[in-house]
Amino acid sequence: MEQTFLMVKPDGVERGLIGEIIARIERKGFVIREMKMMQVTEELAQAHYAEHAEKPFFGELVTFLTSGPVVALRVEGEDVVTVSRMMIGKTKPTEALPGTIRGDFANTMSENVIHGSDSVESAERELGLWFQGQPLNV
């Protein structure tokens, strides 16, 4: 069964949206195999956003991700990467449709409540970063 990495970002945690986001995931029929609330280190944030390391907004991404606790999730289900991305919505709040998590809750490009892996390969990489040394198949 396919797995993906989802993360409730610091703004989502601060605004009390964890329960709403988890409920949406579970209502879709997906199973949360693992979940942890944690304070992200600068090293983990840099590794997570490594693909953006040369971009001018990289520092802002790292600062935001380390600004408060996050909830990291290992989620399993059929076609979970693609379906969860549709549930999340577009990165830009103005482009995210109502009914998507970002369409309903995002404020800005960076304060967009949630992260979700954009491919099976990204999911494997991100799950390895966030749940180190733990098996991908539960």
Swiss-Prot record:
**Matches recorded under PROSITE patterns:** NDPK (PS00469), NDPK_LIKE (PS51374)
Q: What is its main location?
A: cytoplasm
Q: What cofactor does its activity depend on?
A: Mg(2+)
**Active site at which residues?**
H115 (pros-phosphohistidine intermediate)
Q: Which GO terms describe its molecular function?
A: ATP binding; metal ion binding; nucleoside diphosphate kinase activity
What EC designation does it have? 2.7.4.6
Q: Which UniProt keywords apply?
A: ATP-binding, Cytoplasm, Kinase, Magnesium, Metal-binding, Nucleotide metabolism, Nucleotide-binding, Phosphoprotein, Transferase
Q: Name one GO cellular component term.
A: cytoplasm
SMART domains cross-referenced by the UniProt entry: NDK
Listed under catalytic activity are: a 2'-deoxyribonucleoside 5'-diphosphate + ATP = a 2'-deoxyribonucleoside 5'-triphosphate + ADP; a ribonucleoside 5'-diphosphate + ATP = a ribonucleoside 5'-triphosphate + ADP
Record: residues binding ATP = K9, F57, R85, T91, R102, N112
Q: Which GO terms describe its biological process?
A: CTP biosynthetic process; GTP biosynthetic process; UTP biosynthetic process
Report the locations given in the UniProt record. Answer: Cytoplasm
Q: Which family does it belong to?
A: Belongs to the NDK family.
The protein's job, in short, is: Major role in the synthesis of nucleoside triphosphates other than ATP. The ATP gamma phosphate is transferred to the NDP beta phosphate via a ping-pong mechanism, using a phosphorylated active-site intermediate.
* Assembly and interaction partners: Homotetramer.
User: What name does the UniProt record give this protein?
Assistant: Nucleoside diphosphate kinase
Q: Which organism is it from?
A: Exiguobacterium sibiricum (strain DSM 17290 / CCUG 55495 / CIP 109462 / JCM 13490 / 255-15)
